[in-house]
Amino acid sequence: MKASGTLREYKVVGRLLPSVKNPTPPLYRMRIFAPNHVVAKSRFWYFVSQLRKMKKANGETVYCGLVHEKTPLKVKNFGVWLRNDSRSGTHNMYREYRDLTTSAAVTQCYRDMGARHRARAHSIHIMKVQEIAANKCRRPAIKQFHDSKIKFPLPHRVLRRQHNPRFTTKRPNTFF
């Protein structure tokens, strides 16, 4: 899988094709993070074939739909449990991100894993993503933003006034 652009969250439901032996096969549902619905269905069959004796050739996709965030304007903390196949073996990881949506947090996770561990998207398996409360956060990089009296430094900027002369005898004041 190529994690191109921002990933989207899909709910994919699939099952084995009904047969004489098994007329009502059980449905399997997964949350898949993928750039589009084609990749989402492909990842679903990849994971299902690892977990159950199912293949796309003798199965069917019942539903594949986009999952929309309930509150996309509220900043939330997300815990991401993932499995990474690195050059030295398979590693389980827990990472925390702060973002507006679940899919944005997972996209951030893919970028972070690529930057810190040189992990390619195909070798990262997202196992669970959960919104976590502020008191349950473990990582100091996320906990630093849980201060109600948080202050950020003002940028040291030069204001370019449109009608002021370009050359003047006075130095610009950049402290506000």
Swiss-Prot record:
Keyword line: Cytoplasm, Ribonucleoprotein, Ribosomal protein
GO terms of molecular function: structural constituent of ribosome
GO cellular component, one term: ribonucleoprotein complex
GO biological process terms held by the UniProt record: translation
UniProt cross-references to InterPro entries, sorted A to Z: Ribosomal_eL20, Ribosomal_eL20_dom, Ribosomal_eL20_eukaryotes
Localization of this protein: Cytoplasm
Gene3D superfamilies assigned: 3.10.20.10
Xref: Pfam families: Ribosomal_L18A
Subunit record text: Component of the large ribosomal subunit.
Record-stated family: Belongs to the eukaryotic ribosomal protein eL20 family.
Record's function text: Component of the large ribosomal subunit. The ribosome is a large ribonucleoprotein complex responsible for the synthesis of proteins in the cell.
Protein name according to UniProt: Large ribosomal subunit protein eL20
